Structures are given as C-alpha cells and as structure tokens.
Amino acid sequence: MAFVIANFRHVADGLQEGQFAIGERKRASSLDELDPIYRQLLDRPITQTLGIIGSDGRPSLTPMWFDYEDDEILVNTASHRPKCEWIRQNPRMTSLLVNPDNTYHWIQIKHTVAKELREWEPGGEYVTRQLDRIWTKYTGNPPPYGLRDPKIDEKWVLFVCRIDRIATFGKP
C-alpha cells in the first residue's frame, strides 16, 4: 500500500507567500511515516467528520468516532442505517479530524473500503471488539459498547479501508 501525504503551507508561523497551497508532497507506505504532530490527532478522542456520497449523489457529512488499526481506517455503522448502504454503493470516503484546541491544525484522510466485516458472520467478534475499544476511547467507560438500540437486535458492520491520500495542515 502506498499513498501520498500532502502538507499544506499554513499560517502557524505567520503569513507567508503561497499560504494554504500544498507545500511538500511525499510518498508513504505506512502511517508510521506521518509527522507525529498529525499522528497524535488519530490517537486522541477527536470526533471526525466522515464524508460519503448519499443516495441522491450529494455529499453526506457525519460526525462520528474515528478509529484505525495499523495502516487501515476503520469505519463502523449499524447495519440498518442508510449510511451503510451508501458506503456499499460508493466505497470512497474522507475523514477529517480537526484539533479542537486549534482549528488551524487538521488531517484529512481519503480512504476506500477494502473489506466489509459483519458482526453476525464468522469473524464478527472482531467487529464487536472494535466497537468496545472505540467506546472506551471516546467515553472512558469499560466495555461493552453502551449505545446499542435496545428496541431492535442491532448488528454492526465494520468497513476496513485502505488509505489513498492524506492532507495535513497547521501545528498544534
């Protein structure tokens, strides 16, 4: 897997010529190559804005919890939600994580579904463990995940995504 990291010129050090244009571009094959000032945004409990294409062909933006493992982005959703079908129809997504302490410090990750895991199928316990892990990351509460709809037998889907491109901006 290889992707491009595009570092935008920013105003953290004051005004500069060509600010807000892409400065350095580099090829990368792992998130380990990401500058730590952006990598930390992935590890903090920052709510991402997930961009997908809805059934009407327009972008749909959803605030949701962010997770990744190794060099894959993990996107979970309940199987009955429209978002699940929209992702199946168009597996390309974009995640935006903005530093809540400085909105001029962010990372954008474009990614595409590589595989879909279903909680109710063999291997589905991984989906449940991921949901429990992200629950603890964002709430500080121990498992199990505490937001399942009690009125239905809610089952979850996990989209495991490969990274296509990353854009970064600013400093903490």
Language model segments and positions:
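Short, conserved active-site entrance elements at the starts or edges of catalytic domains
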Residues: 20-52
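Short secondary-structure boundary/capping segments
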Residues: 39, 65, 85, 149-151
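Alpha-helix boundary recognition
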Residues: 42-43, 88-89, 152
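Short beta-strand segments
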Residues: 45-79, 85-87, 94-98, 106-109
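Short secondary-structure boundary segments
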Residues: 99-100, 163
